[in-house]
């Protein structure tokens, strides 16, 4: 009997790091594809910071927590390997919440076809959770305008790096807050940020004053903590 591997969540995380003791590797029987269904072989899976919240028992969150004993939640990209669904054909790529498993049986609900000629890694970063978080936060909440100054914390992360590039393309002055010189070099020289603050090395207040002489119009918060207090002190009135 053909089987595939899945990983279930079996315990809630505490305050410390997430470890393997929270998970269980299981073998599952390959499902039969019924009418109106298709089978997806997952090729790439995204590990996102939001997962910690999904594992936690917070019933008032924007999404219910993962039930213990079930496949851990995650977004992924895969290829349809068998189909009895009129709208989904073998060989097509799909993306959506697939979980920590090699194969997924679906009726199409919650999955979207991938039509862009991009590699799976680009699809998961730009069109999955990081890209959606970046675009919704920047445009629905931040409402940036050309000529303004934006500061992005966690600027070298999956969300922050996209926010910075979008803002730069829209004509903003973009300053990123990062935790190393290597990350600072990357966001400035590779991604096109106008400046970088290494919070582990620089005096935050002094460096922000230097890089934002006209104040800060938009702040995209990814980290929390003392960084935001220094940014707030430089914010322009709206």
Q: What residues fall within each predicted segment?
A:
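Extreme N-terminal starter segment of soluble prokaryotic enzymes
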Residues: 2-5
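Short glycine/threonine/proline-enriched tight-turn/helix- or strand-capping micro-motif at secondary-structure
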Residues: 17-29
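Glycine-rich beta-strand-centered segment in the early N-terminal region that forms part
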Residues: 29-47, 57-100
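Short, flexible surface segments
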Residues: 35, 90, 146, 237-238
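NAD(P)H dinucleotide-binding glycine-rich loop of Rossmann-like/cofactor-binding domains
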Residues: 72-79, 87-154
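Short, well-ordered alpha-helical microsegments
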Residues: 88, 160, 184, 205, ...
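Mid-domain Rossmann-like dinucleotide-binding core that forms the NAD(H)/NADP(H) cofactor-binding site
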Residues: 125-202
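Glycine-rich cofactor phosphate-binding loops and adjacent beta1-alpha1 units
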Residues: 191, 195-238
């Amino acid at each position: 009997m053909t089987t595939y591997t899945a990983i279930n969540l079996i315990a809630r995380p505490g305050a410390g790091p997430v470890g393997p003791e929270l998970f269980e590797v299981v073998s599952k029987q390959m499902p039969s594809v019924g009418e109106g269904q298709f089978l997806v072989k997952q090729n790439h899976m995204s590990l996102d910071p939001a997962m910690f919240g999904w594992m936690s028992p917070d019933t008032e969150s924007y999404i219910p927590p993962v039930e213990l004993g079930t496949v851990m939640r995650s977004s992924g990209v895969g290829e349809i390997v068998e189909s009895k669904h009129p709208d989904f054909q073998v060989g097509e790529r799909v993306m959506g919440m697939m979980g920590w498993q090699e194969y997924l049986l679906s009726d199409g609900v919650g999955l979207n076809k991938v039509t862009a000629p991009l590699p799976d890694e680009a699809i998961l970063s730009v069109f999955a959770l990081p890209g959606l978080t970046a675009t919704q936060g920047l445009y629905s909440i931040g409402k940036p305008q050309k000529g303004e100054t934006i500061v992005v914390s966690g600027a070298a992360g999956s969300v922050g790096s996209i926010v910075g590039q979008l803002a730069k393309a829209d004509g903003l002055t973009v300053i990123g807050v990062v935790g190393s010189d290597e990350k600072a070099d990357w966001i400035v020289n590779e991604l096109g940020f106008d400046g970088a603050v290494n919070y582990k090395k620089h005096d935050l207040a002094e460096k922000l004053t230097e890089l934002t002489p006209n104040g800060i119009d938009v702040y995209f918060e990814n980290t929390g903590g003392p960084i935001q207090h220094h940014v707030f002190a430089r914010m322009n009135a709206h």
